[in-house]
From Swiss-Prot:
This is Condensin-2 complex subunit H2. One of its GO terms (cellular component) is nucleus. PANTHER family: CONDENSIN-2 COMPLEX SUBUNIT H2. Its main location: nucleus. Belongs to the CND2 H2 (condensin-2 subunit 2) family. GO terms for biological process: chromosome condensation; embryonic body morphogenesis. Residues 215-239, 252-287 are annotated as: Disordered. Regulatory subunit of the condensin-2 complex, a complex that seems to provide chromosomes with an additional level of organization and rigidity and in establishing mitotic chromosome architecture.
Amino acid sequence: MDDAESRFTHLLQPIRDLTKNWEVDVAAQLGEYLEELDQICISFDGGKTTMNFAEAALLIQGSACIYSKKVEYLYSLVYQALDFISNKKRDQQPASVGADGVDKDATFAHRNDEEEFLSLDDIIDPKKTNVDIKKDQVLHVVNIVPLTPMALVPPEETEKKNNPLCSRKGEVLASRKDFRMNTCTPHPSGAFMLELAGKSPMQFLQHIQHHEEASLAQGEQNAIPEGENDNMEAEKSDCADPVQVLQFSDEGAPAAENGDGAGFLPLDDHDEAGDGEVEQAEHIERRKMQTEERGYVLRERLEQKPASAIKNETSDPWCGLDPFESCEEKPFKKGKHYTLPRGIAEDLSSNKRKRKLPCKLQDFMKWFSSTHWDGSEAMKSRRKGPTFADMEVLYWKHIKERMTAQRQLHRRMGAQFVKEVTLLNQEEELVNPLEEPRDADYLDYDGPADDASDHEDLGENIPACLREEPALGDIEPVTLHDQLSYEELVRRNVELFMANSQKYAQETVLSLRVREWEDKMGPQLQEQEERGAFDIHDYGDRLTAQFSKVGEWRSFASLMADKEPYEVCRYMLASLQLANDYTVEVSQKPGLHEGLDTMALRLLSQQKAHERFKTYTAPSISQQ
């Protein structure tokens, strides 16, 4: 054991000096220990032959530690060697500063020369040079100076202090302009516009409409590919005045939508058919000549097409629709709701078994005549037409129909019919003295009823009610009574409705029993309400007043002669109270049946018990 401890001392105690770690031969010690492990035979002989696992673990740990120290020492030696080599080369180089203090690395040849301005004579004039462009080469790329939108320019610190965003503790978290939704403008498409530039959501919708009209006028000749068309439309919707890019194409474009009457050529090349080929050839030759001379050219403006050409062309109803285009929103219109009257609604077929009530609708003329006509008021002065606002419309409607039918009959029957009608009217005036003459302008209307030509086709469509003159001849509008107020009218109608609706009430078995109970208990409850209040002291005084002297015996039956049953009960309670106060003595015969109705009372004192308590004093107080 001591031999093992001495052998592995350097493994248990790490060596701090890196150079001494190289003195330990880790490979040899591990090889020796491996040979010892090969010689050990593990057997189940009661623990005589054992293997020290702790010793093996310490050996491996110590070996790894020493090996790492060796690597670390070797690493440091390599860096020291590199530093030594570099320092040696630096020492061998001569110094750049001489004995006179002049640095040889720096040159001062032109130190004493005078300063001169930079000469600009060597710059070549661009006007004297021409740019050679091939005829078949078309420049599509235009260099545009990028301009940062104001919405992307970070705000200054002073602007952030105007509207700060503070927390609950008062700490400044951010500013209002730190959020894009506060500095940008929402677009109808859902995007945030960096610069508004006078553009509003309504102008965006108007722009789409103008674009559709221009595309219809342009037709197939100036068609634009779908990809570029969508991009151009998106760019135009984001800016109020889109920048017109340079154009080197060989084709015309539709008129601009800004209203100035001029436009630019499109960016695409397409062939045109018809009479425009000659004009296009002239434009192409002119642009090629300008391109060879100057090197660049702007898009030419086309003459504005007349507005009549756009209006005359109609949209093709069979063309395909854009599935991504928003449909036109139509305002919601609420329809009319009609409610059928009760009498008409019950005539409809229904599977529900309900009791059919009689129809409450009656003839309007009969109801109106019975409600608004009274013989006592016939002689009074009346205004033309009814005064009830709800009935006035119906009244004039019926009168208008009658007059229209009457004029139609006059036109068809001739002058003879007019004479007969006049005679009949005179006879009716004599027979009916209650009828008062009307004014000359009683039924003068400025509406369609006065126009005879409007009713020439009403020959057989005369209302049936107008053919029965006797049934409708006595109807005259009257005014309501002056003293009848609105409240009284409502009360009268409600009472009439309640009286008429009582017979339609459905009676059940439970309702019949309740009604019988009410008929039985109603009189009894009314009788109890009419009785006087029960005062026990008052009834006690009445009972003692019937005794002539103290000590007299009287039966309770004799005292209660000719009394009501409820009075007997009250006197019985009063007698029990008197017996409790020792004012009377109660006795009866022994036996259950023998003692029935044998109650007798004897007066013990005529002094009232409740009065004694008013003058009662305690013995302790009276002795003092």
